Amino acid sequence: MKDLIVLTGPTAVGKTSLSIALAKAVGGEIISADSMQVYKYMNIGTAKITEEEKCGIPHFLIDELEPDEEFNVTIFKNKVMGYIKDIKSRGKVPIIVGGTGFYIQSVIYDINFNEYGDDSNVRKKYEAMAETIGKSELHKKLALVDREYADSVSENNVKKVVRALTFFEMTGEKLSEHNKRERERRSPFDFAYFVLTMDRKKLYERIDKRVDLMFDMGLVDEVKALMAKGYDKSLVSMQGIGYKEVIDYLNGRTSLEECIDIIKRDTRHFAKRQLTWFKREKVVTYIDKDEFGTEDKCLKEMLRVYNS
């Protein structure tokens, strides 16, 4: 029996429903590993779990921050380590659920991200560069020093591009090589790490349907409400897929149809990058929804691994 469970997989694969069934089966409590669901007021565009869907299972790192508050991998790791200790102290099983593989890795391998000192000046330099030369050119600069990491991150994810460039300048080491070495570390946990997958074509169809549903549920109004509160595109939270595109639509830069198509395209690309990340992880159990057929059969296999 393991002392920590991780359930991850690409966006829209169906992690939420299975995580609730898993938590009920093992007496678990859920910690979100989603870099967007931590923000308040951002419900539709993040496909945030509802109170009804939680079925009474305690959830952490959902709706904990204002959209203008800072959230990064270091903050995530520190919070999660505290939640794991708290959950275990009550005789429950911590279950980390979400698709942000880098965040998950930081916890299960106890990675120290502050080992090279204060990087604020270097980081600010690259943040300013993103404004002056543009995110595409900044991404090209990253590719020159760390092609592998650049291939794994979108040019739209300026925060990660800046971090990788900052890390390289501060240490002289590629972040991709640093991450590989950290993955070789011995984990402080005896964990079960599940990656939920399905046929790529079916996944992309689910993504397209989810995006259509988001607009039916009122994504445009959600973004309008956020903007009315003073939250704009300069915030990391508002750079999330679905939010920045709707802002462009509201500002007249795209039509609604173009906006929807861009969100679908970028979400599919995001899912592809997630799958690439998970393939790097060594100690994982893949749960193929097509192979197992039903959620009950997926759960049965997960419980077998958890109890082994």
Regions found by a protein language model. Give the residues of each.
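Phosphate/pyrophosphate-binding catalytic cores of soluble transferases and nucleic-acid-acting enzymes
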Residues: 1-308
